Amino acid sequence: MRRPKKYESGEATQYISRRAALRKLQLSLNDFRRLCILKGVYPREPKHRRRAQKGSSEIRVLYHTKDIRFLLHEQIVWTLRDYKIFAKKSNRDRAIKDFRNLKRRLALFPEIKLDHIVKERYPTFIDALKDLDDCLTLLFLFSTFPSLHLIPREQSNLCRRLTVEFLHYVIASKSLRKVFISIKGYYFQAEIKGQKVTWIVPHYYPFKPQSRQEVDFKVMSIFVEFYTIMLGFTNFRLFHGLNLAYPPQFPTNMLQDNEDTFKDESSFVSDRIAALNFELLRTDKVQEDEEELDIDMELLEQDGDSKRIIKMKQEAQEVARLRTLFKGLKFFINREVPREPLVIIIRSFGGKVSWDSSIFPGSTFDESDETITHQIVDRPSLATQYISRDYIQPQWLFDCVNQRQLLPTNKYFIGEKLPPHLSPFVDSKRDTYIPPEEKALHDPSLIETHEQSDDDSDEEAAQEEEEAVDQELLDAQLQLAYQQETAEYKKYGGPDGVNEDEEDPEEDEEDEDEEEEEELDEQAKRLKEEKQKMSVQSGKVHKVNKRQLHKAEVDEHRLQARMVKPRHRNLFRKLIREKQTKEKEEWLLRKKRRTFEAGEKEARKTAKRAARKEAAAAAAKASKLGK
């Protein structure tokens, strides 16, 4: 029997280094990276690196051997090899100045087709929706970039077109559920086919070029190349699910014959599509989302009234109310407010919106329209204001959507200090520190009240003492009335006031003597029992020794650590460190909260003192004038 050699089986054959993979595929490093990104192949971390590297302790980039075999049968490998041949021949034509042949070669430039890779990586439509988060975030980012060396203008325009099409679907389907503003940008979450899709739209700042060391645009552009194909397929499927024409089109009654349409109809239509303020053309006019919702509710009602069904009914009713949150409201967006994120929010929940026509095409009404209910402003003051509308800050829209109701606008007026903007993406049932504002968001009954002053607390204490004294007097009166009633009962011999012992005086006297003896015995027993009950005993104060409690907890923790198996100790230590980190963060947050509340309390006291001083000064001044 042949003795097996070392590193010919097991973990050593499961992994392959990147250099060996390049030799096997006959590709350059850049082409290999591109192929791995498109196919979804990533480096792997072995459990025992020394065994996987056949005894070498040098840290190398490793891949699964099966993944590299999988890449050997890919059609793109031949296209990437054709690039090398094309580059050599085109350089030769340039060198000999054969421009006729060079032009012919450029027309036959080899193109990579990624359709089969999208179908391969996402067998079902739901799989594509699950991986849509990173796709949308990256495409929204690239849609804001100008033309760069590694980012051609056509790629940025394609990203912009695909993202606008997706936003039109979100508006038409009313599938937006959560929104949030942060330093990174605007967070949006939509529910599509039962899947929650979250993406970030960056803030509209001027572009600042980055150095090569910070951002690798070449690798990012490869991801964008794949994600554009994927989102194109997804948009096509989503639009046809709502019976919308794809690519997006407008009804014929919207394309009026004016100077803009005569000049360039395609640019006119593209500008209106980018405005996100118009309904798109439908292939089937009969499209009622409310009917589908009613059908679903009927199906739920047939299933019974279990807790799960009741919860599903409540969620469906909340979503139905949320879809029409801004129905019947008209908004006007000022110049300083970012237009696109607010248009998405307002139109996704049934509202109407417009802006100044000089900012962007697609406005439907002017600022002077008297039917406007809300005007969104982000400046400290405004010169001209209308009485018929509310002037609010943009945060009001986001908070209304997250709380799923129209909030009062008095906290969001111009120049008002805004309430804290809480994230809806945080789990409300977590074990970490939850600020009181977030508790009030989920349960309005938990809103914290202001601390009472010393005068109010003294008045309440005096009132409680008076109530206690009244209760004692009432108990004494009831006890006296009971004693009088029992004495009358004994005196007259019964409840009817009839003395039955008058018929036989001798027997009555004997019975009375026996009853008196029994009553005396019972009274003696009662007195003994009452004395035992009313006896005062010296109590012992149970002092809690905090040091002993802490020591007991430490001993218990050490015992748990000893009970852990040796192979699980690293995991146990990691969990303990995470727990300690969370506790420390929670302690720091509570400390910050206490400092903040103490500062606010001191500020209120200072303001009260200043107001009292001003009032006293005004009174003194008035008294002097009166004299």
Swiss-Prot record:
Feature: compositional bias, Basic and acidic residues: 522-533, 550-559, 596-605
Keyword match rRNA processing: yes
Residues that bear Phosphoserine: 453, 457
Assigned protein family: Belongs to the pescadillo family.
Record-level GO BP terms: maturation of 5.8S rRNA from tricistronic rRNA transcript (SSU-rRNA, 5.8S rRNA, LSU-rRNA); maturation of LSU-rRNA from tricistronic rRNA transcript (SSU-rRNA, 5.8S rRNA, LSU-rRNA)
Task of the protein: Required for maturation of ribosomal RNAs and formation of the large ribosomal subunit.
Protein name: Pescadillo homolog
Sequence ranges assigned to domain BRCT in this UniProt record: 321-414
Gene Ontology molecular functions: ribonucleoprotein complex binding; RNA binding
Organism: Drosophila ananassae
Alphabetical list of Gene3D superfamilies matching this protein: BRCT domain
One GO CC term, this protein: PeBoW complex
PANTHER family per the UniProt record, alphabetical: PESCADILLO - RELATED (PTHR12221), PESCADILLO HOMOLOG (PTHR12221:SF6)
Compositionally biased tracts (Low complexity): 616-627
Bias-annotated ranges (Basic residues): 540-549
Region called Disordered, residue ranges: 436-471, 489-562, 596-627
Acidic residues bias (residue ranges): 453-471, 498-521
Domain of life: Eukaryota
Localization: Nucleus, Nucleolus; Nucleus, Nucleoplasm
Leader sequence residues: none
Keywords: Nucleus, Phosphoprotein, Ribosome biogenesis, rRNA processing
PROSITE patterns registered for this protein in UniProt: BRCT (PS50172)
